[in-house]
Amino acid sequence: MNKSPIQAVIFDWAGTIVDFGSFAPTSIFVEAFKQGFDFEIDLEEAREPMGLGKWDHIQAVGRIPAVDKRWNEKFGRSMISEDIDAIYAAFMPLQKAKVADHAEPILNAIEVVNGLKDKGIKIGSCSGYPREVMDVLIPVAADYGYQPDYVVATDDLPQGGRPAPFMALKNVIELGVSDVKACVKVDDSAPGIFEGHNAGMWTVGLLLSGNEAGLTFEEYQAADEATLEKAREKARAKLLKSSPHYLIDTIADFPEVVADIERRLAAGERP
């Protein structure tokens, strides 16, 4: 097989390769707010800033106007750093306890990844999960057959996480990639797509398997085309703000994108 001009693909985790609908983090955010402060947020509010590191995510939820209004009504002030610390402290053990339940690969993910490896493409990965959570998730995903060549967690680097390029570029360094334009970043969230842009990579957004559509795999399988199109449009509206080079439904559609990027690289195009 001809060697691909693509050197590496860097995948997000939840909603991209594992955990269809990205339910592990969302449901836990709702529970952490409840446990930390007996404060209610809904799943839509929990999903809003997905893709950020989890401390930053909690802060961003607190800044949603409707959440801030309810927080002020309950506590007489907006959320402060100590509040975020307390919610994060509740989040961590809950997430570690639950993340393995959501480690099953998304349909066709393993086949697609193995196809990339067969072409000599390295598999990087990064996540909005902290290292403590990734240390639980990585071996369970490996049991399912998913073993990327490198993993970066959101708190691994002192420079920080998304939407900055640091996690993606750490993959570049550790995988020995010689040219960022030969890399593809795949994600289901806008911060993860911005991360790819900021690192100088091709970017691919996922419409139906991730956070923005918010479908369970069962809902996805049972949905008629009108329901899927409505979910696509909802996700597209959010992801287009980050201007991905490609938007596809799920990882199953990725091989066509790979072929197109290979063609464009061969023609001398850049991201």
Swiss-Prot record:
Active site: 12 (nucleophile), 54 (schiff-base intermediate with substrate)
GO CC terms of this entry: cytosol
Tagged with keyword Membrane: no
Superkingdom to which the source organism belongs: Bacteria
Positions of disulphide bridges: none
Cofactor descriptive note: Binds 1 Mg(2+) ion per subunit.
BP term (GO), one: organic phosphonate catabolic process
Binding site for Mg(2+): 12, 14, 188
Cofactor(s) essential for the protein: Mg(2+)
Molecular function GO terms recorded: magnesium ion binding; phosphoglycolate phosphatase activity; phosphonoacetaldehyde hydrolase activity
Keyword vocabulary terms for this entry: Hydrolase, Magnesium, Metal-binding, Schiff base
CDD domains (alphabetical): HAD_PHN
Family annotation (InterPro entries): HAD-like_hydrolase_sf (IPR050155), HAD-like_sf (IPR036412), HAD-SF_hydro_IA (IPR006439), HAD_sf (IPR023214), PGP-like_dom2 (IPR023198), Phosphonoacetald_hydro (IPR006323)
E.C. number: 3.11.1.1
Catalytic reactions on record: phosphonoacetaldehyde + H2O = acetaldehyde + phosphate + H(+)
Pfam families membership: Hydrolase
Residue ranges that the Swiss-Prot or TrEMBL entry lists as coiled coil: none
Function statement: Involved in phosphonate degradation.
NCBIfam families linked to this entry: HAD-SF-IA-v3, phosphonatase
Assembly with partners or alone: Homodimer.
Family according to the record: Belongs to the HAD-like hydrolase superfamily. PhnX family.
Name of protein: Phosphonoacetaldehyde hydrolase
